Amino acid sequence: MKIGDLVFHWLTEQIGIVLEVRGDIGVHVLWTTQGRSLFGPGHKEWCCEKSIGLLTNYLTTA
């Protein structure tokens, strides 16, 4: 995963853009959709890399 990648959170069904990747912390994501989350577009969040996946991978397996 790298800066600028489009990602999908499997639990909240949010789509976002990777802002920063830090192995010791995780992935900083700017969410562009709300999905099932309480937080809307524009919210930034640090996520564990295991809880999100590349959107292109999700679209090819769905």
Predicted features along the sequence, with ranges:
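Basic/aromatic-rich interaction segments and small domains that mediate binding to polyanionic partners
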Residues: K2-S51
